[in-house]
Amino acid sequence: MSVLSDFRERYLVRFWSPLPALVALGVASAYYFAITGTFWAVTGEFTRWGGHIISWFGYTPQEWSYFKLIGLAGTPFDRIDGVMIIGMLLGALCAALWANNVSLRWPTSRRRLLQGLIGGIIAGFGARLAMGCNLAAFFTGIPMFSLHAWAFMLATVGGAWVGVKICLLPWLRTPLKVGSQASSLFGDVEGTRRRASLQARLGTGVAVLAIAFAAWRFDTSLVLGMAVLFGLLFGGLIERAQICFTSAARDLWTTGRTRAAYGILLGMAVACVGTFGAIALGASPKIFWMGPNAILGGVLFGIGIVVAGGCETGWMYRAMEGQVHFWVVGVGNVIGGTLVAVYWDQLGTSLALPYP
């Protein structure tokens, strides 16, 4: 095997260990905060996308209290969160293509699509009620030293336990379909090679497109260009290491495996050091209300991600791999977050705004 082939097999095709990847994500998230002034987060931007869609029907969501709080000016191409998420999706797609890991995959049961939609809505609603998901109210929220993130983390773990119990109900269990895979494994080696070669070329094309997109944003703003590059890094890391906080939380209650949870804690510990340094140098931390919204939102988020089968990072990279189920989960996330914006005047005044 040539040096180039060995490099490709080791670093582009094989999945990476999640532990060092999570540490790298912790380091990168701290630098992202220091450079852009905001934390690595996604559900706020997804809610803005919902606001844009609502505006197509003649409504004025920019006048709603929630969008005055999180902002709705411009387009996803003009906002730090927007271009970062586009970078994440491109980075995950590029990594999956280079690994020959992209194919259109439908769930074995249509019931799973409905389950993904409902779970996505619950998770999106809980995330925006708590002002953050497994990123902004957990992985990057705790390093901000915001008390609400600690409450959200504990509530999410409890919600994941409830979600596991719900998924074990007989009417939610999907029957296994067993079949022979011998022909697909051994019958068309040459076809598999051609497919891998095509996907590698497509991955390179996506990488070129991503670099061009970053250059376009750099032409407007240094911060926007850097946000694209960080998004590419985030997306590539989560796809190669298959980072999913849902799996980590679910495994605590089903198999007792803790390796992913340890990796998340270590990544947050590293991020705490970097984030503290950025704050000491003058960056403003993102602090949110420590109210019932953080606890209720965490419980709902924990239930939702287990029912849906993936958290924010999990569904994003799986969607780029061609898993249709997670396209539906993403749509559910946008719907759930937007529902919080619709009802924020009632929710916020009772669950969030009166609290420190």
Language model features: what each stretch is:
Residues 1-356:
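Membrane-interfacial helix-loop segments of redox and metal-homeostasis proteins
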